[in-house]
């Protein structure tokens, strides 16, 4: 079995408070990747609360985003529609860059099967995508972990390139270059 992890494909990361033209540019690639994928898909949902600016993350990144139940928190419409049509799409909320529950959810859902690979796409490569890729690599050390960078955006072009270097050095395969 293969697993596709779609990281934080939420309105605030695409067109909202943390959105960018680059994030909008890669969205069709993510939609196509989901459409063409036949196995398990898991979407992470970055989730914050009204007190976000008082948190450690909020003090270092003082841009309110992905506040639970707001429009910015919601999964982007095209991906949301696909999740309704796709019978093997799970979601997991996370309150930090990486989700401790993501590896456990994947493991529990795939009991009795062999995971051939886990591929990640989404937002933001140098923060949440890299955090989840490394969590998954630590949890599943003998499973191929890959990131399709044609389906990712980052906080800057420099951060994008640095993330690829770090991921490669941690034995995460880079695709879509």
PLM regions and their residue ranges:
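Active-site acidic carboxylates
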Residues: 1-91, 146, 155, 161-165, ...
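Short, glycine/serine-rich, charged loops/turns that create anion-binding
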Residues: 10-11, 48, 96, 125-127, ...
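Secondary-structure boundary/capping motif
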Residues: 22, 101, 128, 155-156
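Histidine-anchored nucleotide/phosphate-binding helix
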Residues: 29-34, 130-140
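Short, well-ordered secondary-structure micro-motifs
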Residues: 53-55, 102-104, 131-132, 158-159
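Internal catalytic-core helix/loop-beta-alpha segment
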Residues: 69-127
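A short glycine-rich beta-strand->turn/loop micro-motif centered on a GG-aromatic cluster
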Residues: 118-124, 144-157, 175-177
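Short phosphate-binding/catalytic loops that engage adenosine nucleotides
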Residues: 141, 172
């Amino acid at each position: 079995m293969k697993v596709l992890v779609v990281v934080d494909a939420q309105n605030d990361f695409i067109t909202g408070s943390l959105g960018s033209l680059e994030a909008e540019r890669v969205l069709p690639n993510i939609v196509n990747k989901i459409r063409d994928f036949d196995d398990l898909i898991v979407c992470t949902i970055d989730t914050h609360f009204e007190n976000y600016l008082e948190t450690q993350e909020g003090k270092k990144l003082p841009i309110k985003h992905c506040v639970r139940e707001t429009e910015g928190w919601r999964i982007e419409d095209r991906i949301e529609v696909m999740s309704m049509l796709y019978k093997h799409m799970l979601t997991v909320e996370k309150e930090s860059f990486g989700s401790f529950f993501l590896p456990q959810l994947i493991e529990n859902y795939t009991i009795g099967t062999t995971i051939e690979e886990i591929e990640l796409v989404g937002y933001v490569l140098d923060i949440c995508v890299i955090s989840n890729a490394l969590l998954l690599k630590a949890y599943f050390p003998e499973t191929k972990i890959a990131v399709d960078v044609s389906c990712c955006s980052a906080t800057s072009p420099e951060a994008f390139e640095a993330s690829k270097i770090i991921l490669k050095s941690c034995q995460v395969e880079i695709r879509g270059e």
